[in-house]
């Protein structure tokens, strides 16, 4: 079997830091930029149409939303609303897709998976709110409210997350404060100090619990602004006591085939880079007691980002060295790995949604993971469907069935053989 590799779907004219996929429209939304520095590298949010053409997944640019001097570093999606972390502020965007009547989509295309250029495609960059009409599709992006979410000396929003019903969003940044805002008015409803130093990640559960991880080596569980508990990993974990670890990422995920079941997943990385780097760890936690259920090493490459599939079946990881991996959430066993797929830090990973357009786009594969990196590329990682029964077992059963049939015939009809 040949060496696994990711498929390059799209290459942007700027570094990519965040991506999301809209299950309703099949839009892949990738964002990034060069920041405020006058380097000639633009800032924007690109809307890509995912299509299955000749059995291969393809992405083509529908619309480019210019974010002027602000690079989008993190994204959250709630229906047709995007929450974009841009420097110290959170900007809400609303996008609308319309199929114009009397136009037919182009069905022909390359058999190779990857980016394709639409005929008569518009220039790569358009002003804010511009509309693009390739193949009868009209997409419009509108800036909604914006609010400053971080107030440190060097303010930067590090993470944004919607709650389960998309009525609230939570933000965290370098000042260590969690702030919760109403959607879409961005009226602040809650603020509290969660960590000393910057917040690395946060995730909201359906019961209202909020988990935050920070550079102060802590992972905390909150109910509104009240501390419920702190995760205790290293005390009983496999890591050596003289190796300081910090929590890098956290995500809630469903428990497959268990209605209402929930798990928390965290990634722990060494706080310092050593000549012989210690391993990073992936941990699954009980969402009621917040006690660790299972911990596995996930290699010596430092993990940069984490994603959980809709059903909670798979975990996706990206590393600072550009590698991408897919794990089974239940056993934390690695199923897929591409070393240095990007060659530079992977900034975000996300799974193809399992509802809406997702199953149609997935085709015969079990799951699909998308990754973006500072190298400006968006890659696709496909996991082939696993056989439910091993081939050797099927062959053994067939042989056994033949032997049993012969014995029965011999018993029923003596002298048959």
Curated annotation (Swiss-Prot):
<dbReference type="GO" id="GO:0003700">
    <property type="term" value="F:DNA-binding transcription factor activity"/>
</dbReference>
<dbReference type="GO" id="GO:0005634">
    <property type="term" value="C:nucleus"/>
</dbReference>
<keyword id="KW-0677">Repeat</keyword>
<protein>
    <recommendedName>
        <fullName>Guanine nucleotide-exchange factor SEC12</fullName>
    </recommendedName>
</protein>
<dbReference type="GO" id="GO:0003400">
    <property type="term" value="P:regulation of COPII vesicle coating"/>
</dbReference>
<comment type="function">
    <text>Was first identified based on its probable role in the regulation of pituitary gene transcription. Binds to the prolactin gene (PRL) promoter and seems to activate transcription.</text>
</comment>
<keyword id="KW-0010">Activator</keyword>
<dbReference type="GO" id="GO:0003677">
    <property type="term" value="F:DNA binding"/>
</dbReference>
<keyword id="KW-0853">WD repeat</keyword>
<keyword id="KW-0539">Nucleus</keyword>
<feature type="repeat" description="WD 2">
    <location>
        <begin position="194"/>
        <end position="232"/>
    </location>
</feature>
<comment type="subunit">
    <text>Interacts with SAR1B (GDP-bound form). Interacts with MIA2; recruits PREB to endoplasmic reticulum exit sites. Interacts with CIDEB; facilitating loading of SCAP-SREBP into COPII vesicles.</text>
</comment>
<dbReference type="InterPro" id="IPR001680">
    <property type="entry name" value="WD40_rpt"/>
</dbReference>
<dbReference type="GO" id="GO:0070971">
    <property type="term" value="C:endoplasmic reticulum exit site"/>
</dbReference>
<feature type="topological domain" description="Cytoplasmic">
    <location>
        <begin position="1"/>
        <end position="388"/>
    </location>
</feature>
<feature type="topological domain" description="Lumenal">
    <location>
        <begin position="410"/>
        <end position="417"/>
    </location>
</feature>
<dbReference type="GO" id="GO:0005789">
    <property type="term" value="C:endoplasmic reticulum membrane"/>
</dbReference>
<comment type="function">
    <text>Guanine nucleotide exchange factor (GEF) that regulates the assembly of the coat protein complex II/COPII in endoplasmic reticulum (ER) to Golgi vesicle-mediated transport. Selectively activates SAR1A and SAR1B by promoting the exchange of guanosine diphosphate (GDP) for guanosine triphosphate (GTP) in these small GTPases.</text>
</comment>
<keyword id="KW-0653">Protein transport</keyword>
<dbReference type="InterPro" id="IPR045260">
    <property type="entry name" value="Sec12-like"/>
</dbReference>
<keyword id="KW-0804">Transcription</keyword>
<feature type="modified residue" description="3'-nitrotyrosine">
    <location>
        <position position="10"/>
    </location>
</feature>
<dbReference type="Pfam" id="PF00400">
    <property type="entry name" value="WD40"/>
</dbReference>
<dbReference type="GO" id="GO:0015031">
    <property type="term" value="P:protein transport"/>
</dbReference>
<keyword id="KW-0812">Transmembrane</keyword>
<feature type="repeat" description="WD 3">
    <location>
        <begin position="298"/>
        <end position="337"/>
    </location>
</feature>
<dbReference type="GO" id="GO:0051020">
    <property type="term" value="F:GTPase binding"/>
</dbReference>
<keyword id="KW-0238">DNA-binding</keyword>
<keyword id="KW-0813">Transport</keyword>
<dbReference type="GO" id="GO:0005085">
    <property type="term" value="F:guanyl-nucleotide exchange factor activity"/>
</dbReference>
<keyword id="KW-1133">Transmembrane helix</keyword>
<dbReference type="InterPro" id="IPR015943">
    <property type="entry name" value="WD40/YVTN_repeat-like_dom_sf"/>
</dbReference>
<keyword id="KW-0256">Endoplasmic reticulum</keyword>
<feature type="region of interest" description="Disordered">
    <location>
        <begin position="101"/>
        <end position="135"/>
    </location>
</feature>
<feature type="transmembrane region" description="Helical">
    <location>
        <begin position="389"/>
        <end position="409"/>
    </location>
</feature>
<dbReference type="InterPro" id="IPR011047">
    <property type="entry name" value="Quinoprotein_ADH-like_sf"/>
</dbReference>
<keyword id="KW-0944">Nitration</keyword>
<feature type="repeat" description="WD 1">
    <location>
        <begin position="152"/>
        <end position="191"/>
    </location>
</feature>
<keyword id="KW-0472">Membrane</keyword>
<keyword id="KW-0931">ER-Golgi transport</keyword>
<dbReference type="GO" id="GO:0048208">
    <property type="term" value="P:COPII vesicle coating"/>
</dbReference>
<dbReference type="GO" id="GO:0006888">
    <property type="term" value="P:endoplasmic reticulum to Golgi vesicle-mediated transport"/>
</dbReference>
């Amino acid at each position: 079997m040949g060496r696994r590799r990711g498929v390059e779907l799209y290459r942007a004219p700027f570094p990519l830091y965040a991506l999301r996929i809209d299950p309703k429209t099949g839009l892949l939304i990738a964002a990034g930029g060069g920041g405020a520095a006058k380097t000639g590298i633009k800032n924007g949010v690109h809307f890509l149409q995912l299509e299955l053409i000749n059995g291969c997944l393809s992405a083509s640019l529908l619309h480019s939303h210019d974010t002027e001097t602000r690079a989008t570093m993190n994204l959250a999606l709630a229906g047709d609303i995007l929450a974009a972390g841009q420097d110290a502020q959170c900007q809400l965007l609303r996008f609308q897709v319309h199929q114009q009547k009397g136009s037919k989509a182009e069905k022909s295309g390359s058999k190779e998976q990857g980016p394709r250029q639409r005929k008569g495609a518009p220039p790569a960059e358009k002003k804010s709110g511009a509309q693009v009409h390739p193949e009868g599709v009209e997409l419009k992006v509108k800036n909604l409210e914006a609010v400053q979410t971080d107030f440190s000396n060097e303010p930067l929003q590090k993470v944004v997350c919607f709650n389960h019903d998309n009525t609230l969003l939570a933000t965290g940044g370098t000042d260590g404060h969690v702030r919760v805002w109403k959607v879409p008015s961005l009226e602040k409803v809650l603020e509290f100090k969660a960590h000393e130093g910057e917040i690395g990640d946060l995730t909201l559960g359906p019961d209202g619990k909020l988990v935050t991880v920070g550079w102060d080596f802590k992972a905390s569980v909150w109910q509104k602004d009240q501390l419920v508990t702190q995760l205790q990993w290293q005390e009983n974990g496999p890591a050596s006591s003289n190796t300081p670890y910090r929590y890098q990422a956290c995500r809630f995920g469903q428990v497959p085939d268990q209605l209402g079941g929930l798990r928390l997943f965290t990634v722990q990385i060494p706080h310092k880079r050593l000549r012989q780097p210690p391993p990073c760890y992936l941990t699954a936690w009980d969402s009621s007691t917040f006690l660790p259920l299972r911990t596995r090493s996930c290699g010596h490459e430092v993990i940069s980002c984490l994603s959980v599939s809709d059903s909670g079946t798979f975990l996706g990881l990206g590393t600072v060295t550009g590698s991408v991996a897919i794990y089974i959430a239940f056993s934390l066993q690695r199923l897929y790995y591409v070393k240095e797929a990007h060659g530079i830090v992977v900034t975000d990973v996300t799974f193809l949604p399992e509802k809406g357009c997702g199953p149609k786009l997935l085709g015969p594969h079990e799951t699909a993971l998308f990754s973006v990196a500072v190298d400006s590329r968006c890659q696709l990682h496909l996991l082939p469907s696993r056989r439910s029964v091993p081939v050797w077992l099927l062959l053994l059963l067939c042989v056994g069935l033949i032997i049993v049939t012969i014995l029965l015939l011999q018993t029923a009809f003596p002298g048959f053989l």
